Amino acid sequence: MDRERTCAVPDLGPEVYSRWRASEIGATTERLESQLVLELVGNVGGRKVLDVGCGDGELALELAKRGAVVTGIDASAAMIDAAKRRAVQHNADIMFQVATAQQIPFAAEQFDVVTAITVLCFVEDASPVFREIARVLRPGGRLIIGELGKWSSWAAGRRIRAWLGSRLWRQGRFRTAHELCGLAGQAGLMVESVRGAIYYPRWGFATRLLSPCDSALGRLTTFGAGFMALSAVKPAR
């Protein structure tokens, strides 16, 4: 992968997603992250939604079930193939195609909502991604960015794995809530809120003990959050 994520992220294929969701901690973490993202997305019935970095289509499918007209893009052909299979299995009408976050292949002001979940953590320069998202959003449209938190036990573990030679996490880029807000503002978007999730360490007993408190903590601070979600809108004319 080059510095702008113009190709697929190594070591991160559909089978990795499947194994993660099959684990206890993975299932709980995925549920809490999805709850936060969907809460910030709000009502999508009849709206055109673009899921940037759609992966294997899990979020795109949930948005389609809620009545959205969904398009998903991802730099990985393997992920897009998996997303298409998922849509067929659930009889969902979703358009998927291979494309990068830096060059979204759609005309300006096409979408009411854009989601981009754990995309920027593999992009060194996130500014072009925010500009592209702002370009394809309609005035009044909403962006939901979901990212890995910079100051958390999860991020510390990923840094250690990078130091030990992980190809995946050597490319990881962790940003603060302040940095994400700045990037959104530079792209002409108005930040509505930033919320945190996943405050427990990556241990099964800690997940069971602390996950019930996650939503309340996420409304108070993003410090210590393994995951953050930002909601921003494109000003109406």
Residue ranges of model-derived segments:
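Acceptor-substrate binding/catalytic loop of class I
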Residues: 162-179
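Short catalytic micro-motifs in class I SAM-dependent methyltransferases
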Residues: 118-121
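A short glycine-rich, Lys/Arg-flanked "PGG" loop and its adjoining helix->strand segment in the class I
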Residues: 127-139
